[in-house]
Structure formats: C-alpha cells, structure tokens
Amino acid sequence: MSPQGDVQPVSGSPQPQGTVVFFHPDLGIGGAERLVVDAAVGLQEQGHHVVIFTNHCDPGHCFDECRDGTLDVRVHGAWPIPMSIFNRLTILCAILRHLQLLVQITLSGELQALKPRAFIVDQLSAGLPVMRFLFPDTPILFYCHFPDLLLAQGRQSALKRLYRVPFDWIEEWSMGFAQAVAVNSEFTRGVVARTWPGLKEKVDTKVVYPCVDTTSKQDDSSAGGADDVFASGDYKTILSINRFERKKDIGLALKAFAAIPEAQRKGVRLVLAGGYDHRVAENVEYHAELQQLASSHSLNHHTVTSFDASSLSSIPSDASVLFLLSIPNSVKTSLLRAARLLVYTPSNEHFGIVPLEAMLARVPVLAANTGGPVETIRDSKTGWLRDPEDVNAWSNVMRDVLGMPDDNLRQMGADGEERVRSLFGRKNMALRLEASLDEILAKRLARPPLFFPIGIVVSLVLAALAVYMQLQ
C-alpha cells in the first residue's frame, strides 16, 4: 500500500496539560531546530507548559520563537566542555555536554521543580539511560530524524570506523530506554527498522511528520526587484530549491531541462536556487560542476550572488539557466510565486520540506519516487513522482507542464495547498505528538535495572566532574 494513502488528519481540541520538557543540543536555524521549535510551539498552543533545555542558543542565530519569549529556552552546560576539539571528536563532546546539562539541572533541582510530565529528546540519545535512572517515572519520546550512524562521514578511513564503533553501539542501545521513538516519515521508519532490527522489537516507532507554517501571511514588502525579475511573466520558470550538495542531484534537473527540444525551451528559465557557503568546499566544487554541465549542454547560464535591484536587473536576457546562491526569504517567495513547476531532485530524502512549501504556494511538484516525497505528493494530483534514474521521464513532465493549460495548473496548485493545510500544518503535527505522548503516559513504566553498564557510570562521573569545574 502506498504510504501517501496512510496520511490522515488528526482531530483534537486544546486542553490544559502538564509540563513537557524538550532536550536539544544546539538551537540554531537548521531543519532539526525548526522541527523542535514547531513541536514545542504546537504543544504549547494545545495547552501544555513547555520548557526547552539546550547546551547552546545564540540569540543572533536562532529562530524568533527562541528569543522573543514565545518559548521558555534554558541554556546550561555550554562550558567547560567545548563543542569540538580541534574540529574533531564532535560527537564525543556533544554527548559529554548533554550529560553535563542533565546532571547540572538535576543537582540544582531545576528539573525536579518543573515536575515534568514527559521528556522529548532528539538528535542525541546517549543521555536517555541517565534520564531513566534519574527520573524513572517520566516517560521519554525520542525523535529520530535519521540514524546518525548512516549520516556520519569519513567512514572510508579505518581509524574513523574504529572511532565510530562505540558511538554507533551507544546510539542503538540508548534508544531502547525511550518509551517510543518518533520519526519524520514512513521511509525513515523503514530505515530505522532495517538499521536496528532489535530496536523494533523493544520500542514502538511512530511517524510524526514535520510541518510548515500555514498561518502566516507572506510579506511582499521586501520582494521588490525580485518580483520585477522573476514574477514579471516574461519567462516560464522551472524552479529547484536545494543546497548545493552532490547528494541533492541538482544535475538531474539540468539534464532533464536540456533534453527539452530547444524550440520548446524558448522563453523558459531553469532557476537553480539554494543554500551555498563559499567556505564549504563541496558547495563551491558542485556549483562549478553544474556550471560545466550546463555549458556541456549548450545552455547559457548566469550566477547571482547578490539580490539587490541592480544585480537582479543585470541578469542577461539570454540566460536560460540561473544559479542563485544563498537566496533570502523574500527572493524565495518571489521564485515560488513565479514558478510553474518545482523540481525536487534528491533520492531517498528523509522527508523533504521544500515540496510542502511549494505546494502551500500552489506550485505543482516533480520529485523522485523514493523517500519522503512519496508520502507528501499525490502523483498526478498535486505533482508527479518519477524515477530519478530516468532523465527522459523528468524531461517529459517538464514539457507537459510548459504546455499545460493554466487552469489545470491552478487546480493542481489548489489541491496541493489543500493537502498541506489539512495534513502538514503545525496543529496537526502537535496533535500527532500529543497522541504519542498520551499513549506512552498511559503505559505503566518498568523500573530500570539497578546497575547500568560501566560506560554510563563513567559518563556520569565525567558529567559531574564538568559541573564541579564549572562551579569553581
């Protein structure tokens, strides 16, 4: 059965609840942080008292809800343990910082004073056994964005593989101390089951989809020159929004676009926009590779790095491919307003928030028929799902969209918007999370064993030592 048929709205009503305590290592502005913030705000809107504990939250580099008083964010354990040692040992430092935070807020009585109803933890599972030891009557929901052992890079090195062995083991073992594990898609649930078959037998795994903000109005005041260029109607726009990383397979969009006969590409632009950091070697290298690929297909291309009116107005009229590096939100809004089709090229994407943003903006989506998009996009209804190995199939969809009557596109856009609003809004996410919490709260918790493995005892000693050093 197709996973997309399993997505159903969740009903519920706001009601007073107890305290829910979140633990997240670093509240920056990434996708995991956006999910945590949305989950916390959503539960708060359902009547829960919510507190987030974190090792780090820079007011200048976090989401508004974390600094404007919407959420109660408490920072502990930021020192003396660093985030890394000479840009290495990152996972070890993260675990030690997390354990230090746990012990510190327990010794100070801060955590007990909250009388937590449940813990929600994500990214780092190593502290779960300690939580069960210190608070045996408080259930834990662990949100697994994706198995860390599958994300860790550099495993080609024998030394790196050896270094990762204990952390890979700790990841699986410690997740067994949660009462339930939540994941971001049916696809990720399948990956978790295959990666840790033993965990599946011990812990229930639930799907809690990430969300997009369906309530805020787009601010067009800062769009300015971007609207003049992209939403002017001078070109039909095929849009891709993704980080400039090889795993995103942006080249697929270029190849499919190049396969459209030249006569049908007249008056059409392929816009490749997304995250880019000149300090990241892969971003720089992949952008150069994509430029070379465009040139090899005789496609005129132009790169934009500044988005003021002057820079945008200087885009050559004969450029059929545009590379937009590190676009601001106002430009992203203009691009979605102008796009006839959003092309989402990654294969086996864990979830994929960009297709939801496009559908909310009433833009049909063409995506790979693997991973999370299979669950969010309804094929031939809100977009198309195609084999990422079949360039011609992608090119054919592009050609069909370019020739499709505007009324048909508008209907697909309306269907996409309705799907996102009914299934992937923040309230729906909060209700799914709330249902998961209610389920684990209804179960009688088994007391943890009296003695944990030596590794946990050592970790506690290290954390206590770190707290002692901090208090000196």
Task: Tell where the protein language model's regions lie, with residue ranges.
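Active-site proximal beta-strand in glycosyltransferases
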Residues: 118-120, 133-154, 160, 206
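A short, well-ordered alpha-helix in the C-terminal region of glycosyltransferases
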Residues: 407-423, 435
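Nucleotide-activated donor-binding/catalytic signature segment of Leloir-type glycosyltransferases, i.e.
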Residues: 274, 278, 283-330
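N-terminal strand-loop element at the rim of the active site
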Residues: 5-17, 24-29, 42-94
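Aromatic "clamp/platform" in nucleotide-sugar-dependent glycosyltransferases that forms part
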Residues: 347
